[in-house]
Amino acid sequence: MKEKTGYYGEFGGRFVPETLMAALYELDSAYHRLKDDPGFKAELNSYLTEFAGRETPLTFCRNMSEYCGCKVYLKREDLVHGGAHKLNNTLGQALLAKAMGKKRLIAETGAGQHGVATAIAGAALNLPVEVFMGEEDCERQKLNVFRMELMGAKVHPVSSGTKTLKDATNEALREWAKTVDYTHYLIGSVVGPHPFPMIVRDFQSVIGEETRRQCLEKEGRLPDTLVACVGGGSNAIGMFYPMLNDDVRMVGVEAGGRALTPGNNGATLNTGSPGILHGALSYLIQNDDGQVGVTHSISAGLDYPGVGPEHSMLKDLNRVEYSYVMDDEVLEAFSYLSRTEGIIPALESAHAVSYVLKNRDSFDRDDIVVICLSGRGDKDVSSVSKMFGGEE
């Protein structure tokens, strides 16, 4: 990638109104100044270990390994404080915002996990937080809305458009443009205009760095295959990036939803085409007129119609395989992991688990397969129980 211009091959860039250009340049320059600063790194590391609970374990799944006929490990991002990998990024960006003298954080959220992680970081660093969340997502994730409010964040339900993550992001960008002098927009995935995809990737790379080290310690070699779910793609890029130059197969798993027909999935890299959304050029789910298409996924965190520009480049280079699984397969994987390993995965993460279960015949006995378990499933238990016909 040309770091200076923020392009990954042909993807990425800064397609934003003039009012935001200065803020993006300011953020880029502050990040380059601070990312290698020993004081900043030490403070971030201290928060990640003492507060977020890193490093996270690399858990060997005995029962699933036996069933799949290979060695299956889970990288346990579900054990990070707050229940998902999101805090790796929000702590980093909140510290960055503080160092830049910003007085307030705003964020967009889909499943609510990024909103919760931003609220946690804001509370820990004493920065006020406002979160934009689609009305439909607020309804799907009531518990996360309450969690955010409990930690002092103000949640703005967004009623425009499809009332989901795309619309929440539009509102957050509008708010940022109005209050850019004292506000930091804390983007939750490797999307948006440069330098956001780079910053989020770097803060999430701790996942892959730890996995690399832990696998060498446990197995004496690197994994054969890494598998992670892809919505915007931050847990996946965090897992993949530190091993891109190694001989490791990588699979990103998108939301196949109900079907691969328009409006029924969130499989951007499998069904989309290049276009511009939220300030960057990347693959998009769009109609013939170039309008952003309707998406669907069983998991609120994977129904984003775009994807990180670096993933778009990795797809076109054939460095990473991008696959998909369907909603019903995800539910099976959700139940399977809970039942056989005693670990309830987030519906997002269950997409990655499902891919391994579904493709178990393609692995050899000695293959080491690492799944990024990006989050825990507590937030999904009540909606899944309804799908299974149970009581809440």
Swiss-Prot record:
Coiled coil: none annotated. It comes from the Archaea. It is an enzyme of class 4 (lyase). The modification N6-(pyridoxal phosphate)lysine is found at K86. It holds the Pfam family PALP. Keywords: Amino-acid biosynthesis, Aromatic amino acid biosynthesis, Lyase, Pyridoxal phosphate, Tryptophan biosynthesis. Its cofactor is pyridoxal 5'-phosphate. GO terms for cellular component: cytoplasm. It catalyses: (1S,2R)-1-C-(indol-3-yl)glycerol 3-phosphate + L-serine = D-glyceraldehyde 3-phosphate + L-tryptophan + H2O. InterPro entries: Trp_synth_b_CS, Trp_synth_beta, Trp_synth_beta/beta-like, TrpB-like_PALP, TrpB-like_PALP_sf. Pathway: Amino-acid biosynthesis; L-tryptophan biosynthesis; L-tryptophan from chorismate: step 5/5. Signal peptide: none annotated. Its EC number is 4.2.1.20. Gene3D superfamilies: 3.40.50.1100. One of its GO terms (molecular function) is tryptophan synthase activity. HAMAP family: Trp_synth_beta. Belongs to the TrpB family. The beta subunit is responsible for the synthesis of L-tryptophan from indole and L-serine. Tetramer of two alpha and two beta chains. This is Tryptophan synthase beta chain. It comes from Methanocorpusculum labreanum (strain ATCC 43576 / DSM 4855 / Z). The gene is trpB.
